[in-house]
């Protein structure tokens, strides 16, 4: 038996020509397999700022895949959509907004696969969001 180091990918939007924003098992599987081929042992599929229906679709796919035996998926990473517009880089501006508990609480309560969520601390509502998220075993970045 050999023990070798492996990478834990905490921020990956896809791989092998597939994007996690496609929200399908085929896309998730293709991207994850590509990462595994090059030494990744565990991964947090990352979504760019997106709509709530897209987050829910990706979370459903992620939940199914995390339940598979020996799944390398540790949880879903949401990069936004609670970001500062001036610092949002390549994010889709129409999806950027301030944290709203009427939006994020149902997402968190319904989708336990979400484990990382990026948010800008200077936004209105961000302090409340920042206090709520760690209570749910998230990494807030």
Indicate residue ranges for each PLM-predicted region.
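Short amphipathic alpha-helices and their capping/turn segments at secondary-structure boundaries
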Residues: 1, 58-70
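Divalent metal-dependent hydrolysis catalytic cores, especially in the metallo-beta-lactamase
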Residues: 13, 29-58, 71-84, 111-122, ...
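A short acidic, helix-capping loop that chelates divalent metal ions and anchors anionic groups
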Residues: 14-19, 84-91
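Generic structural signal for well-ordered alpha-helices
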Residues: 32, 56-63, 104, 130
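Anion (oxyanion) recognition and catalysis
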Residues: 36, 67, 134
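Short acidic, glycine/serine/threonine-rich loops at helix termini
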Residues: 55-57, 86-92, 129-130
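Histidine/acidic residue-rich metal-binding segments in metalloenzymes
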Residues: 97-141
């Amino acid at each position: 038996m050999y023990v070798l180091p492996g990478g834990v990918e905490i921020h990956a939007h896809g791989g092998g020509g597939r994007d996690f924003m496609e929200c399908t098992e085929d896309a998730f599987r293709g991207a994850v397999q590509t990462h595994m081929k090059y030494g990744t042992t565990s991964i947090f599929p990352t979504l760019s700022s997106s709509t709530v229906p897209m987050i829910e679709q990706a979370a459903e796919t992620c939940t199914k895949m995390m339940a598979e035996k020996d799944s390398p998926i540790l949880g879903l990473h949401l990069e936004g959509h609670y970001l500062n517009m001036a610092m949002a880089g390549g994010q889709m501006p129409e999806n950027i907004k301030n944290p709203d508990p009427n939006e994020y609480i149902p997402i968190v309560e319904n989708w336990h696969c979400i484990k990382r969520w990026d948010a800008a601390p200077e936004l209105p509502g961000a302090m409340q969001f920042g206090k709520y998220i760690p209570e749910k075993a998230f990494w807030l970045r």
